[in-house]
Amino acid sequence: MQKVTFPNKILPYFLLAPQIVLTVVFFFWPASQAIYQSFMREDAFGLKSTFVELANFTAVLSDPNYLHSVQVTVVFNVLTALLAMGVALLLATAADRVIRGQTFYRTLLIWPYAVAPAVAGMLWLFIFNPAMGTFAYLLRRNGIAWDPLLDGNQAMGLVVVAAAWKQISYNFLFFVAGLQAIPKSLIEAAAIDGARGARRFWTIVFPLLAPTSFFLLVVNTVYAFFDTFGIIHAVTGGGPAKATETLVYKVYNDGFVNLNLGSSSAQSVILMAIVIALTAFQFRFVEKRVHYS
């Protein structure tokens, strides 16, 4: 491969400058501010601050409400990732077949990804609204007392479905691309040997999708941590009784609603550390089981 050379030595730095500026402004600067404020105790108006060392972290880690948010986040992340990836893989497998109008169907499946999180949340809230929602009416007709604004389990189920629906389109694109990259000769050879559809999928298709699945696992984990804030805020507001208050929503609630800036900053630092550690763990241990050839 021929080495790429630039006629001007300064040009590469100009090309990198926009990305460097964005990274510094929208990541390093906010992260440094959060780390600084996590060691301070400020009043609600930010007029006075006191250095308290690790007091904010100690208070957060000993707070039962924070530990409850950790449990809620784990349940929410696992359910959202499994549902979004499972349904996307099922749809991608169906769309990979040569059928009439497959381009049209694929386009329809991609559209939900363009919907804003808050809009997606309001859409599902309207569908399952206890007073006027279509599905809520059907559930009541079948004897199910549906009210996600009062029942914590129902609220969790609703935000999981809304968050997974939003992410299915993204996963679908990558699974379709992964399926199209699998040589058809392998599947045809297995079919000739007498392997049925389910056996061909689990012994040939699914192992060859391991790189794609691993990548989507990391992406969906980060998505469930951060990008679902708008859905939870629009649908449940963290309720009822903190049943859907995830870590990122508790950061917002304590910082912007309760104006406890020190505690909120400490929580954001802990959340950042959790995501970094979890991602590193996935790349360090899970990736060992992924075969790229």
Curated annotation (Swiss-Prot):
Keywords from the named record: Cell inner membrane, Cell membrane, Membrane, Transmembrane, Transmembrane helix, Transport
GO biological process: transmembrane transport
All residue ranges annotated as the ABC transmembrane type-1 domain in the record: 66-282
Family statement: Belongs to the binding-protein-dependent transport system permease family.
Taxon lineage: Bacteria, Pseudomonadati, Pseudomonadota, Alphaproteobacteria, Hyphomicrobiales
Cross-referenced Pfam families: BPD_transp_1
Subcellular locations according to the entry: Cell inner membrane
Superkingdom of the source species: Bacteria
Subunit description: The complex is composed of two ATP-binding proteins (UgpC), two transmembrane proteins (UgpA and UgpE) and a solute-binding protein (UgpB).
Function: Part of the ABC transporter complex UgpBAEC involved in sn-glycerol-3-phosphate (G3P) import. Probably responsible for the translocation of the substrate across the membrane.
UniProt key word Transmembrane: yes
Protein's membrane topology: Multi-pass membrane protein
Organism name: Brucella abortus (strain 2308)
InterPro entries attached to this UniProt entry: MetI-like, MetI-like_sf, UgpAE/MalFG_permease
Listed GO CC annotations: plasma membrane
Residues passing through the membrane, by range: 10-30, 72-92, 108-128, 155-177, 204-224, 261-281
Protein name: sn-glycerol-3-phosphate transport system permease protein UgpA
Main localization, broad class: membrane
